[in-house]
Amino acid sequence: MQVTSQFKTVALVGRNNTPGIAEPLTALALCIAKRGFEVVFEADTAAEIGVTDYPALRPAEIGARADVAVVLGGDGTMLGIGRQLAPYRTPLIGINHGRLGFITDIPISDMREIVPQMLAGNFEREERVLLEARIMRDGNPIYHALAFNDVVVNRSGFSGMAELHVSVDGRFMYNQRSDGLIVATPTGSTAYALSSQGPILHPQLQGIVLVPIAPHALSNRPIVLPDDSKVSIQIVSGREVNVNFDMQSFTSLELSDTIEVRRSRHTVPMLHPVGYSYFATLRKKLHWNEYPSHEEDPKP
């Protein structure tokens, strides 16, 4: 079958160490290949499920070769591959094989119907922002990372509160004693930041949110900043303070280390089925639909 879609090569990425994921991945690969698309697998995914019929590529090779990546897993899988493919602007399609699934919005039961429709051009596209962070020690950068959801400075479970000196665009904001501080994107506002009483930011809002974790002073409240802000967090006191990036990579900090966070120049293109609604996602995932909506007749 000749492909007339804007997509020619489709990469499949699966959630690691997940029993039962081989069958849906191989079924999806066959479904896509039968429609004339070239199918490649992310290398670790291919090795884990024993796929040998398709090329196995590292993320950088996927970025250079694939036109779109279909991710079967949970939000964590999307976060990980999203960071790696962001420099290549490879669009992502998410199939939920996890628990919550805020950004993997296609049910696995519907993937063989919906994914081919999207590959044929029937989708809605949006751009999700990333954060970039670097750790400065004695005036020198020692670590750099991207974050799809959030950059989190926090204490270990066996140490006391950390004192953090926070400034925005070079202007002093406050000294905060707390268990830590979350700097989140709109995408990340429904992750750790939400559980720490932060606000929900619509994904298309141009902002980042700072959310204290269990602050000593109850007046230390979350604040939303313009997304062109540069946030600097210096470690004033505290033992065993770490910084995490999407809770998937971390590094230990020393006193006087400074974490500089700003919006990355990279964005992640995300593709959704036609009719996708962010508000429908919130209703479903946060159980807002426990009460009848205006679109539904109340039950008698």
Swiss-Prot record:
EC code: 2.7.1.23
BP-aspect Gene Ontology terms: NAD metabolic process; NADP biosynthetic process
One Pfam family cited in the UniProt record for this chain: NAD_kinase_C
Catalytic activity: NAD(+) + ATP = ADP + NADP(+) + H(+)
Sequence similarity: Belongs to the NAD kinase family.
Xref: InterPro entries: ATP-NAD_kinase_N, ATP-NAD_kinase_PpnK-typ_C, NAD/diacylglycerol_kinase_sf, NADK
Co-factor(s): a divalent metal cation
Active site, per annotation: D75 (proton acceptor)
Superkingdom, taxonomy of origin: Bacteria
Protein name: NAD kinase
Organism: Paraburkholderia xenovorans (strain LB400)
GO molecular function, one term: NAD binding
Keyword NAD: yes
UniProt entry keywords in alphabetical sequence: ATP-binding, Cytoplasm, Kinase, NAD, NADP, Nucleotide-binding, Transferase
Disulfide bonds listed in the record: none
Function: Involved in the regulation of the intracellular balance of NAD and NADP, and is a key enzyme in the biosynthesis of NADP. Catalyzes specifically the phosphorylation on 2'-hydroxyl of the adenosine moiety of NAD to yield NADP.
Protein localization: Cytoplasm
